[in-house]
Amino acid sequence: MTLNTFGISIFMLSGLCAMGPLSDETEECISCHETETPGIVQDWLSSRHAKTTVLDALEKERVERRVSTENIVEKYMEYVVGCYECHSQNINVHTDNFEHFDYNINIVVSPKDCATCHETEVDEYSHSKKAHAIDILIKNPVYSALVTESLTPHHGKNIEGETCYGCHGTEVSVRGMKTIHTKDGDEIEVPDLANWPNQGVGRINPDGSKGSCTSCHPRHSFSIEVARKPYTCSECHLEPDVPAYNVYKESKHGNMYMSLGSKWNWNEVPWVIGEDFKTPTCATCHNSLVADTEGEIIATRTHDFGSRLWTRLFGLIYSHPQPKDGQTWNLRNKDGLPMPTTFTGELAETGLIDETEQVARKSKMSGVCLSCHSTSWVDGHFRQMEEQNQAADAMVLKATQHLQKAWNSGVANAENPFDEYIERLWIEQWLFYANSARYASAMSGPDYA
């Protein structure tokens, strides 16, 4: 019996059936891994990757495509996207590549690998704040001090990976090789990864790329349904510091989602408002390709999650215009600090989007809202949000002025603005309370205001 025939027999005997043609390499992977890691194989079998060849994906109407790369290597076209197709990309730049049963395999699948088929999405993501999330902490001494001195004092690398860097991402590196045992007791050599596991949005991968597609599309089903549901976002965007999910859950939109969401169609592209779903989730407003029932596009798909946002609401002392790109450590305020505002709220003169861009982005977001709401409702909503931001910023400014008195009198040391008791009270004022109030207004969850 040949190995390929053996692989097919394994599928049949175990009740599994590949939904599309497998490459010889992937078939061999599955012949072992359906025993070694059966959950992974079953999850993959439920995926669109297992059911659709690349050629089939490219033959879809452009607006319905989930593949954006135009010139995909021919050898991949006639097969479904399997183990080998993802874990054998760009082997010359993967420091985690190793010889595994006569194949060169990467442990970590990175955005650069996903770009083989999803080039546009990866390019868009590379400009986002999410892609630079780890550097936003590490390369900005102000935020780095907040993490190391205030939020995770006396920490170790593993603790960092479970706290701030669990969401922001770690830098995954290879320490060397190690021996592990299969279920049959066989020994195999695999790379020993540092700062792993991690699926933070700004993870630095062994090939040098930034990001983790599995933050939103968990392996190995890579489901668009999972990515569109708010539970996925809630992994990182929840209270106390980023209470987006909590606010959404208590909003009218969240009420309707919780009550009716099980009846919606989560897999269609484009996603038709009023037909596939009734109220927005995080993905609807921030990145999904949304159309009306006549097929007219309301919002184009984007993986730059800030591209429809004009005001930055969370994580910083004051609300302010969005930064022009994700490399926010390059911002400089009037005091020379890498921040978008001064401690008293004055905006940095460069690096933030201008009023014209703010209007354009607000128009994009309003277009989604206007699919269900009247102009007066939408205008009133955003007017309330702007006033709430101003009120929250004013309260933070009052707290900051009290703190400045402490700094000026020597009661607190201004060298590190985050490590003393009075400073920690000030952090709570903007990181927890002001953030909650801003979010509450943006997403109509009034109890959090």
Task: Describe each model-derived feature in a short phrase.
Residues E74-E85:
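Long, well-ordered hydrophobic secondary-structure segments characteristic of membrane-embedded
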Residues M19-E28, E275-K278, S366:
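Local sequence-structure signature of Cys/Sec-based thiol-disulfide redox active-site neighborhoods
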Residues M1-I8:
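Bacterial N-terminal signal peptides that target proteins for export
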Residues I10-M19:
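Hydrophobic h-region of N-terminal signal peptides that target proteins for export
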Residues T37-I72, N92-G161, T170-A449:
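Primarily the internal scaffold of c-type cytochrome electron-transfer domains
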